[in-house]
Design a protein with these regions (language model features):
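N-terminal signal peptide c-region/cleavage motif recognized by signal peptidases
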Residues: 16-19
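Internal alpha-helical transmembrane segments of multi-pass membrane proteins, especially GPCRs
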Residues: 7-8, 121
Length: 160
């Protein structure tokens, strides 16, 4: 009887180990979606008279698309990337991180992360509650979030 129990226990361990060893399946942005988001954000800002840069990153924080508009400031590509990274990292708009830093002095320690930027313009891109990437816009003071949202809106039907 003890042999049967031992064999049963070994089988249970092996079966549970193989079930846990499956690959994770994650949703991610495609290049086509990232291009549509970046172009949508750029079009919105240009229509308002701004010269901006737009960055779209994937769920792991890797750049997919960066656009530097005609006449955009030299700093704007980096600013757009950092805003997107901030939104992805904290799973919230980069403006929320700015508010958090203003409300909680201990949050300033997060400034040590080289790609974090506490300015509006970065928005997470979500499928339900799952953050699959982020978009950042730099160069349209007070309107960066609006431009980022316009980009996300271009692919909203694909984010369901």
């Amino acid at each position: 009887m003890s042999t049967k129990v031992l064999l049963g226990a070994v089988a249970a361990v092996l079966l549970s180990a193989s079930a846990q060893a499956q690959l994770a399946v994650e949703k991610n942005l495609t290049l086509a979606m990232a291009q549509a988001i970046a172009n949508g954000a750029m079009e919105k800002c240009v229509s308002m008279g701004f010269k901006v840069s737009v960055a779209v990153i994937d769920r792991a924080g890797h750049p997919i698309v960066t656009l530097r508009g005609d006449g955009a400031g030299l700093h704007t590509p980096e600013g757009a990337d950092r805003k997107a990274f901030t939104a992805r990292t904290f799973r919230a708009p980069s403006a929320a991180f700015l508010k958090r830093m203003m409300d909680d002095p201990s949050a300033h320690a997060s400034e040590e992360y080289t790609r974090v930027l506490a300015l509006p313009g970065g928005l997470p891109i979500k499928v339900g509650d799952d953050v699959v990437g982020a978009v950042g816009v730099s160069g349209s003071p007070g309107k960066d979030d609006e431009c980022s949202q316009a980009g996300i809106d271009k692919v909203a039907d694909q984010l369901k």
